[in-house]
Amino acid sequence: MTQEYDRDLLALLPSLEIIDGLIKYYFEYCNWIYRHVNQSSFTHQWERYKSGAKADRIVLATACATMAIATHYLPVQHHLLEGFQDTHEEIGFKFFDVSSTSLQRHQAESKAYSLDLVELLLIRAHFLTLSKTEGEEIWHVRGELITIGTAMGLHRDPGKWRMHRDVAERRRWAWWHILLLERSVLFGK
């Protein structure tokens, strides 16, 4: 990873081997109900990020959010966290803080909406729900997701736009998860 502009954030993360292990753990064990992040799209972008081909703060923020959730679900004394002195919860919050900083930097540079941004906000809401510490922040993310999803037309049938099938499916999943989040926050679950 050779992104000069985020060296300070990358310095807060473990080795690439641990990062990849946590991301792999997330996709294998942590998203069987809530598939907020499209695995094939993210994996492709993550490989480009690691190679230095594309420096993207949304990708870094998403990687850190997946690591935070994976840390939450890891069994005690799992080999991926052997080098850490902190609790699983503290490690997860450290990864989430890096995700937050990366997202803030992205938003300071660009206000453009994308499916990658929607997926990042969804996975961040998932972590906030698991951590049970930032109830007000979940309301904020929920409102932002409804606004972004509607602005992007995620609520409309993508079949009418003659999109590639994979893109249409990804858009449907994103909208479905926005609605699930909206309903769960609305009903206080």
Which residue ranges define each predicted feature?
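A generic secondary-structure signal for well-formed alpha-helical elements
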Residues: 30, 34, 70, 74, ...
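C-terminal transcriptional activation/regulatory domains of eukaryotic transcription factors
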Residues: 2-116, 121-134, 161-166
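Enriched - but not universal
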Residues: 35, 49, 142, 178-179
